[in-house]
A protein has these predicted regions:
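Glycine-rich adenosine-cofactor-binding loop
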Residues: 10-18
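N-terminal beta-loop-helix "entrance" segment that forms/cooperates
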Residues: 40-56
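Short amphipathic alpha-helix with an adjacent loop that forms part of the alpha/beta core around
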Residues: 69-80
Length: 339
């Protein structure tokens, strides 16, 4: 497959990597058009403003169709020299759309395919202590369902490792962004130089699927877990997400910026969640093998209440909260989370 005839690029979806690639393509003199969704358009970019505002400030044309399969602007703009590349787009493409691109409709996948299919990739990876990252350009076929299933051939791929300092999703996002933009530059360099890309099948025997998550509904802390598992779980729902949830005196609170210490432990199971020390380094809560040192406690509305926490209080999650979290199935559409 050669792509050196491409002059126009449709970017579909959202995220910082899409924005970075759009800017890169503009410097290479490509015609760039972005097709996004309401939830993607509201995403905050590295500069602190929304994707929509960033695109406007860069003079990059963008559209927000309900369904690209029936959108006249999308359909009428496709030419034999148009390439499409998705970044978490919300649409599934029909056979007619795929044929219009003549094999040049792709998806960018920032995961080590076929592992971590689904959603909430970094949360799942943090829970499993996985530091393997990857970038893939994958052919979109009619069987692809965004966030559920993909089987198209791999056009171009690279693997990398997340640094040992990466602890929370924000760390993974930041590290991945640099790798992804560099990967896409290399992809375009090779395409412009006339490389004949070889399509490779996805090795399905290694497939792993983990579903999308809803932090508020599913990120509830089970204080019976080991100290390490508590740390991993709370880190996995840290920035840019709302934080892992529990209760304090019957009120919902969310924890962030945690670390563990073993100097004071272990603790009896009856002691888990008890706040036994508060000082300038954090709120110390007992857990089975040691201390969970919490750097930030937020109320349900996101206000920092760390300074109000006192010794003798207990973080506790009722069983009904835990059962609801384990049985909830997160679903998203173009507007955001479905309730």
């Amino acid at each position: 497959m050669k792509l050196n005839s491409v002059k126009k690029v449709y970017l579909l979806g959202g995220g910082g990597t899409l924005l970075g690639f759009a800017k890169e393509l503009r410097t290479r003199q490509y015609e760039v058009v972005v097709f996004t969704s309401p939830r993607h358009s509201r995403e905050i970019m590295p500069g602190g403003v929304t994707l929509a505002r960033e695109l406007d400030s860069q003079g990059i044309p963008w559209h927000m169709p309900e369904d690209v399969n029936t959108n006249a602007v999308f359909l009428d703009g496709i030419t034999p020299r148009t390439m499409g590349l998705g970044f978490g787009e919300v649409w599934t493409f029909n056979r007619e759309i795929i044929d219009l691109f003549d094999g040049k409709l792709f998806d960018f996948m920032g995961i080590p395919l076929p592992k971590y299919r689904g959603g909430a990739h970094y949360t799942w990876q943090i829970l499993r202590k996985s530091r393997l990252g990857a970038c893939n350009i994958q052919v979109i076929n009619e069987f692809m369902v965004q966030g559920e299933f993909d089987s198209g051939e791999i056009v171009f791929a690279r693997e990398f490792s997340y640094p040992d300092t990466a602890r929370i999703p924000r760390d993974y996002f930041d590290a991945a962004h640099k790798e992804e933009v560099a990967f896409l530059r290399e992809f375009m360099d090779r395409a412009e130089n006339g490389q004949d890309f070889t399509l490779s099948p996805v090795p399905e025997q290694y497939s792993m699927y983990f579903p999308r998550l809803n932090t508020v509904r599913q990120g509830w802390i089970n204080w019976s877990w080991s100290t390490l598992d508590l740390e991993l779980f709370i880190n996995a729902f840290d920035d840019p997400y709302a934080g892992a949830s529990t209760e304090l005196d019957g009120q919902v609170v969310r924890l962030k910026r945690v670390r563990t210490e073993t100097l004071d432990g272990p603790f009896h199971p009856f002691m888990t969640g008890l706040v036994y020390r508060v000082n300038s380094t954090g709120v110390y809560a007992a857990s089975l093998q040691g201390s969970l040192v919490v750097g930030c406690v937020l109320d349900e509305h996101g206000a920092d209440i760390t300074a109000t926490i006192c010794t003798g209080q207990r973080f506790f999650t009722p069983m009904e909260r835990l059962e609801a979290a384990m049985t909830f199935h997160a679903q998203y559409d173009a507007k955001g989370a479905k309730t």
